[in-house]
C-alpha cells in the first residue's frame, strides 16, 4: 500500500497481495483477502479470511490459520488503526483485481508509469 502514515503500523504483513486466490462471491465480486482483525494480546492483527487454497474461513478458522502459518496482513496498536488499514487494503485489492491494473500500478509508482514506456 502506498501511504500508511499515521496508522501506527507495527509490522507489515507477510502475504503476497498480488498472488492471492480469487473467490467469486454470491454478489459477483471477487474476494482475495476478505480481512478481519483480532487482538493477539500484544497487537491488533489483520488477517485474511480467504485461505491460500481459496476457501472462505470463519473467524475462528482464520485465527487458527494465523497461529498455524504465521501469515498476516498487518499489526497495529489499535482496532481503529487496523480497521483503517483493512479498508485501504480492500480498496486497493478491489482496484487491482477488478479495475484497471495499469492505473493501480501507476498509483503505486507515484505517477511514473508513463515515464517507463
Spans of features found by a protein language model:
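Short arginine-rich
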Residues: 87-105
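Compositionally biased, intrinsically disordered low-complexity regions enriched in proline and serine
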Residues: 11, 19, 67-68, 91, ...
Amino acid at each position: 500500500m502506498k501511504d500508511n502514515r499515521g496508522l501506527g503500523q507495527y509490522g507489515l504483513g507477510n502475504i503476497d497481495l498480488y498472488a492471492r486466490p480469487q473467490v467469486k462471491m454470491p454478489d459477483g465480486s471477487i474476494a482475495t483477502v476478505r480481512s478481519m482483525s483480532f487482538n493477539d494480546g500484544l497487537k491488533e492483527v489483520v488477517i485474511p479470511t480467504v485461505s491460500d487454497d481459496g476457501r472462505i474461513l470463519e473467524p475462528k478458522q482464520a485465527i487458527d490459520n494465523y497461529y498455524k502459518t504465521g501469515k498476516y496482513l498487518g499489526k497495529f496498536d489499535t482496532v481503529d488503526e487496523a480497521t483503517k488499514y483493512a479498508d485501504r487494503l480492500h480498496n486497493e485489492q478491489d482496484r487491482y483485481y477488478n479495475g484497471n491494473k495499469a492505473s493501480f500500478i501507476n498509483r503505486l509508482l507515484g505517477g511514473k508509469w508513463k515515464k517507463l514506456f
